[in-house]
Amino acid sequence: VVIDRISGNALQKQGIDPAAMDARREINGFTRSEAAVVSPRNSEHVEDNFNDAVYSGARFGLSYIINEDWDVLVQHTQQTLDTEGVFAYDPTVEGESSAIRFQSDENSDEFGLTTWTLNGRLEKLDVVYTGGYLDREIDTLTDYTGYTNGGLFSAYYVCTHYETPDNPDDARCLDPSKYYKEDTTSTRLTHELRFSTTMDTPWQLTAGVFYDEQEVGSVGQFKIASPEIFENLASSWNALAGDRGINSDGGPFSPEISFVNDVTHTIEQIAVFGQLGYEITDTLTATIGARWYQIDDIYRGATSTRDVTSRLEAYGQGVLDPAVYDGLGLDGQGVVDAIQDGSLEIGLLDGDGVLTVDDTIFKFGLDWKVNENVLLFANYSEGFRPPVTNRLGGDAAANDTGAFADFRVPVYSTTDTLDNYEIGLKGDFLDGILRVNATGYYSEISDLQTSRFDPANISFLVFTDNVGDAEVKGIDADITWLATDNLVINAAFSVLDTELVSINPELEGIAAGVGSELPYSADFSGNISARYFFELDGGKEGYVNASLTYTGDRLAGMVMNAYAMEDATRLIYGTGSGLKIKDEGDEFKGATYPGADGETIRGGRYIQESYVIGNVSVGMTYQNWKVEAFVDNVFDKSAILNIDTQQYTPKVVTNRPRTIGLRFSYDYY
């Protein structure tokens, strides 16, 4: 039933009754060869404590004092992380530590990071040059069976209804097990050169230049279609549509691979920055800063159905010949019409298909030293996130009805910008035993970026879009109290009020509406810790440390698809997830079908409920060594860190269980 409705009633259109097929499932007593619905098997993957992680690595640093004015520091970190399993549980299974998987999940992550810093003086100038180089490789194999519950073409990939149009009773839906395999390599090189004045004058100047180049190359292989129906896809489906910018040999790939995504994403940034501070009086200082930047977002490569490089070049060259876009796998006339009416933006691309943006952002500040112990400040600053090119920009929605009529994947998301206003204080009080840092702020976010994944209606690949505008109001504070000579208490808290103030019309009824809270933002969060020191015999010092951390309720994601997830979960597992939902709309327009009860599916988002985590430790130090026993998550609380809905049934990412351990360190120098 789930496969049929998510596929636009593909089975019913062939005269097949999905409910009758479900009744003839393998688990209902039919053999695997005669069952109308063949269930996936995962008994070979069942085990306790299946999510293993093994870390190994090394770090070293070398510092050299060249002379009294110059010194250099070089550091290198090498690390490998190998994991098996997943770190999210299925809420439909009893307890909070079990996951349902039909494919082994494996991940290997290896990186080397080298950084360098040169400090020096040139007359009245302090000079800092710093840089870094990262080389990283990630190999991933993950269960992709969840696509069956949310992919528009699920019925086509696993059911035989197209082969039995004259005999509906012979139709079968075969084992839907799927996987996704990705090999990713990434490099990043950064340089920054900064000068600061040290003259005894009322003004101070800092200026510099920054360069950043990062490249990510990935080859992703999707096993989606049933190999019993599609016996050899190497010659028909999975060959790449282009060869420029790819990281593989172009195929053919394994015969069970349905689609391949082979792309190279390069981002180059150069920036020039400066800040001028001026002491208006002995107690009042004003600052002004500016940063000019230029970013090139370069996307190259191909998928099994799209030549990404050629498509972006055509957009950048302003091609308006429908035949060109027809040859690139698009509906040519529709694309040209969208470009001409402005609904498909391409103006930021150059003739090579490179997305280039540049701008200048500013900041202003005013500091007032009320006395030797108290500083008040007010700041205004601007920020941004650069635009992102989409590999399938221009594609029409796979489901061209309802809220998705005339929708096209944007060629790129535009820059989202931040205007931030803040006031605050930093001060020592009560003769220095109480220190308070507090900030109140108001932020305006324009053209807020969000990632979208909607295989039921648009595309089975993630893309970025702009959801609308938002406002954030908040207060942050941290407090340190020297309660006694031996007891130090630290506390911090954050209060947030977030609101979506406008929304992209294409997302109305899909994303949360105007006035809604932003996701992942707790109204209140805070922590408090206490550390008590005591003397021991022989010059040793002991300590006891305890802390509590509270995080309030947060909403999961921008899309209000929780009720749709619950409806699918009940049909698949026979029970709901038990997760809380905030009701936010009479209709979720991302579901183009009624619920199992025949009613319209409402809009809502999952609530990631509040939690408290406690940690304790006791330790001892003596000269160069330190030993500590600790208990993290002392109450063994299973917290909801994130609720993932991309598998069309919710999965809950949780924290580590109670962990007891011993640490030992020795400083030798």
Task: Please describe what each predicted stretch is.
Residues 1-83, 112-113, 186-191, 199-212, ...:
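Transmembrane beta-barrel wall of Gram-negative outer-membrane proteins
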Residues 63-67, 195-198, 208-212, 263-444:
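Structural signature of Gram-negative outer-membrane beta-barrels, strongest in the C-terminal barrel
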Residues 69-72, 124-127, 202-205, 283-286, ...:
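Repeated loop/turn-to-beta-strand initiation elements of outer-membrane beta-barrel proteins
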Residues 76-82, 122, 133-137, 211-215, ...:
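Transmembrane beta-strands of outer-membrane beta-barrel pores
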Residues 117-144, 369-385, 391-394, 412-475, ...:
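Membrane-embedded beta-barrel scaffold of Gram-negative outer-membrane proteins
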Residues 222-223, 229, 549-569, 575, ...:
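C-terminal beta-signal and adjacent terminal beta-strands/loops
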Residues 282-286, 435-444, 463-560, 663-669:
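Gram-negative outer-membrane beta-barrel transporters
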Residues 521-621, 635:
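C-terminal beta-barrel architecture of Gram-negative outer-membrane proteins
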